[in-house]
């Protein structure tokens, strides 16, 4: 299977334990995970942030005053995807621990999830859409060697 091309910018904000998160997110792995979820060529920025920045972005853009695991800002979709994915490191770490997943496996899931959002998939529009998106995530992650994230 030929993968779509990806122009990737990987950024890390300033937050506690940043080195741990950098170690879980080598650039080649991040690019691989995203490329497997792409249905078009893309330019994507991935930014890993602390709780304060994550909360501010969620509050300012979604009117939800708490830090969430991943935010997707999609600017264009097919035939060329342009998007920013913002992942909140402390939330991702807590969820990984609570669900007994490795940090890397949870990041892979959230990057696939965010990339699907950037292409127009939405799990909040109805049960059928949520099932379609989850099935795609499971299939993509299995192809990458990760377990079903919903178990």
Curated annotation (Swiss-Prot):
Keyword S-adenosyl-L-methionine among UniProt keywords: no
GO biological process, one term: rRNA processing
An example Gene Ontology molecular-function term: zinc ion binding
Descriptive protein name: Endoribonuclease YbeY
Localization (cell): Cytoplasm
Enzyme class: hydrolase
Pfam family, one: YbeY
Protein's UniProt keywords contain Hydrolase: yes
Family listed: Belongs to the endoribonuclease YbeY family.
Cofactor: Zn(2+)
């Amino acid at each position: 299977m030929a993968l779509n091309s990806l122009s990737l910018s990987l950024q890390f904000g300033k937050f506690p334990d940043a080195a741990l998160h950098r170690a879980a997110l080598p650039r080649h792995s991040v690019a691989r995970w995203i490329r497997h979820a792409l249905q078009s060529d893309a330019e994507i920025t991935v930014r890993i942030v602390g709780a304060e920045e994550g909360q501010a972005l969620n509050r300012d853009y979604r009117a939800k005053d708490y830090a969430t695991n991943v935010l997707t800002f999609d600017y264009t979709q097919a035939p060329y995807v342009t998007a920013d994915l913002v992942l909140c490191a402390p939330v991702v770490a807590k969820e990984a621990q609570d669900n007994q997943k490795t940090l890397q496996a949870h990041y892979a899931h959230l990057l696939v999830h965010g990339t699907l959002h950037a292409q127009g998939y939405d799990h909040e529009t109805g049960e059928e859409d949520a099932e379609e998106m989850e099935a795609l995530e499971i299939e993509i992650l299995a192809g990458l060697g990760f377990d079903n994230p919903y178990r």
